[in-house]
Regions:
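Long, low-complexity, intrinsically disordered segments
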Residues: 27-32, 278-287
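Gly/Pro-enriched, hydrophobic low-complexity segments
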Residues: 76, 111, 126-127, 175-267
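An acidic-aromatic
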Residues: 27-37, 98-159, 228-233
Length: 287
């Protein structure tokens, strides 16, 4: 759910997912056993690392989103970044997202930094910076999943909600899942009853609030486990509209197309692949 800043891409931070340390406290040290003739009690049954109930909730959310032909929602991303004094400062981005499977995506983002716009129409990717009147355009692959991969690898463009808009969200998260458990229910988040689950995905600990009835993700709270600063990231998802009509001209912008061109390229091309700490970037996918 968080990434490095992308040059003109404003305060867009990459992070396919959020993580947060597990709620459980560290296990207390065992007391020295007393000598006794009584038969030792059997060891308690180990809790599975991947609880079926938690997996079922994540699968249901994935299935609900994957089945939608069109999708609209608002994503507000709160993330921390170190200040010059060393204290973590919180910044925010707001994304208005419109998607049409299998090959169209628009993201209109406002932020504490420069605003940005992203268009994908199945043939071209267009990234537009309104304040600077700059646009980067590239030929695009025929699916949203492939376009997101290209945008990240070519230009370090990443959205914190990426993992929830791909063709099969559960497949994406399950490939790197190491832990998943059910926490309970909340009646506070999103104005509805949500099921709370926690899981580790590609080195990120995530707590998710998912609608108990509609199966839609409402809140994600995450921290990279390998980040020594334990910076926190929160994604609020709201205003869901599934299978609503989308005008044909949604995924293009004449104003963006006429802006001053700039290369569709990584903002730091001198950086060698793999030099970024894992905690600061999107975990690489398995091949």
């Amino acid at each position: 759910m968080i990434r490095n800043k992308c040059l003109w891409w404003g305060l867009l931070v990459s992070a396919s997912v959020f993580l947060v340390l597990p709620n459980a406290q560290s296990k207390p040290a065992k007391k020295k056993a007393k000598t006794t003739t009584a038969e030792a009690s059997p060891a308690p049954e180990a809790t599975p690392s991947l609880e079926p109930k938690a997996l079922d909730i994540l699968k249901a959310a994935s299935s609900r989103l994957a089945a939608a032909h069109t999708m609209k929602f608002t994503a507000i991303h709160f993330y921390e970044s170190p200040s010059r004094q060393g204290h973590p400062l919180a910044f925010t981005t707001k994304s208005e997202v419109t998607l049409q499977r299998p090959d169209k995506l628009r993201v209109i983002m406002s932020a504490d930094g420069p605003a940005s716009e992203f268009y994908y129409d199945g043939k071209k990717i267009m990234a537009y910076a309104p304040a600077e009147n700059l646009v980067a355009v590239a030929d695009a692959p025929p699916t949203i999943d492939a376009a997101l991969e290209q945008a990240y690898h070519s230009a370090a463009i990443y959205f914190p909600f990426d993992d929830w808009i791909v063709a099969d969200p559960y497949k994406e998260m399950s490939e790197g899942m190491k832990l998943a458990y059910y926490i309970g229910q909340s009646k506070v988040v999103g104005g509805t009853t949500t099921d709370m689950v926690a899981y580790i995905d590609h080195g990120v600990f995530i707590q998710a609030w998912i609608g108990a009835e509609d199966k839609l993700p409402r809140l994600l709270h995450a921290t990279y486990l390998e980040d020594p600063e334990r910076l926190r990231h929160t994604l609020v998802l709201s205003d869901w509209q599934l299978d609503a009509a989308v005008p044909p001209d949604t995924f293009a912008s004449a104003k963006a197309a006429s802006a001053n061109p700039m290369p569709f390229a990584h903002p730091h091309p001198e950086a060698s692949p793999g030099t970024e700490p894992t905690a600061k970037g999107k975990p690489p996918k398995k091949q």
